[in-house]
Amino acid sequence: MAQDFNVTPWEVKGKVDYDKLIVQFGTQKITSELKEKIKSIINDELHVMLRRDVFFSHRDLDLVLKDYQDGKGFFLYTGRAPSLGMHIGHLIPFIFTKWLQDKFNVNLYIEITDDEKFMRNPEYTLDQTRQWAYDNILDIIAVGFNPDKTFIFQDTEYIRNMYPIAIKIAKKLTFSEVRATFGLDTSSNIGIIWYPALQIAPTMFEKRRCLIPAGIDQDPYWRLQRDIAESLGYYKAAQIHSKFLPPLTGPEGKMSSSQPETAIYLTDDPKTVERKIMKYAFSGGQPTIELHRKYGGNPDIDVSFQWLYMFFEPDDNKIKKIEEDYRSGALLTGELKQILIEKLNDFLEEHRQKREEAKKLVNVFKYDGELAREMWRKIHE
């Protein structure tokens, strides 16, 4: 039987079967034993996204935890290809990464790939992608990272420091490997063929194991890294993978910046949020109130419930009650949507305030913070 979904770094199609994806990608499921181990190490409750399997898969997370317990430590790395506007789905890896940084007190490197975005789309100018980089950096800083343990860098600015290690990586990668991994062809520009070397480079910023929290669609990059890292004297990168926050339009695919009806942007005002949720959020309810009261709704396919479950309602007792009431028909689709609208608007209001404050912190994260200063003095070999 043909697989009815497809996941690559560039697109996600169909309703993703995450158990099948683990087998297809050759990753490991995050087991209850692994969760308990994290809990005992941090001596605290797990993040809601870990408790509820939003982060569900990994490579070498067990080795990262062992290194931490043995006193070797580890570091975090994630990134962002800048776009005109960030949406709620873009924040998931950053919010979870902040939690990891807080709990383990480790360095974090955030790569802003203004170069990749420019090279990938023939219509974009470098000025555009650099402006988007600045705007997106404000949203990232607003998440609340430790300014002295976080280095945010743009590829077009930090390239001199990365270039020696990047060319060593590039020399290890063949065109056929890169082409097969990313679906490139003879019409692909040579910049995008070379680019994977730059995305791999930050995994070698320290002589420790690197942990990358990211959507599972980004996994192919790190397979290439894992093939070559040890030959360059570095660790294979470890990963912890997230599921996709479903688009408003239903359980298939993922949110897209280029399709406004699929996403809530971080800049959406309260009225826009309400309009989008009421109009577009896919419902698991019945066609009439009478039928819904009688038969109940299906939270498994209801986007409003899924957003609350994955992100916006961290209280386990409250989410259980919402699920029970929706399944029984006691809670209507419109009422469920209103719960999400209120949570979303509260979140976005707080984010907007933090984003405004972030304007004063850009230089700290990029140039003047403790880790940033140290990184600008380094040439990575």
From Swiss-Prot:
InterPro entries: aa-tRNA-synth_Ic, Rossmann-like_a/b/a_fold, Trp-tRNA-ligase, Tryptophan-tRNA-ligase_arc. A motif ('HIGH' region) lies at residues 82-90. Keywords: Aminoacyl-tRNA synthetase, ATP-binding, Cytoplasm, Ligase, Nucleotide-binding, Protein biosynthesis. Its EC number is 6.1.1.2. It is an enzyme of class 6 (ligase). It comes from the Archaea. It catalyses: tRNA(Trp) + L-tryptophan + ATP = L-tryptophyl-tRNA(Trp) + AMP + diphosphate + H(+). GO terms for biological process: tryptophanyl-tRNA aminoacylation. GO terms for molecular function: ATP binding; tryptophan-tRNA ligase activity. GO terms for cellular component: cytoplasm. It is found in: Cytoplasm. A motif ('KMSKS' region) lies at residues 254-258. Belongs to the class-I aminoacyl-tRNA synthetase family. This is Tryptophan--tRNA ligase. It comes from Sulfurisphaera tokodaii (strain DSM 16993 / JCM 10545 / NBRC 100140 / 7) (Sulfolobus tokodaii).
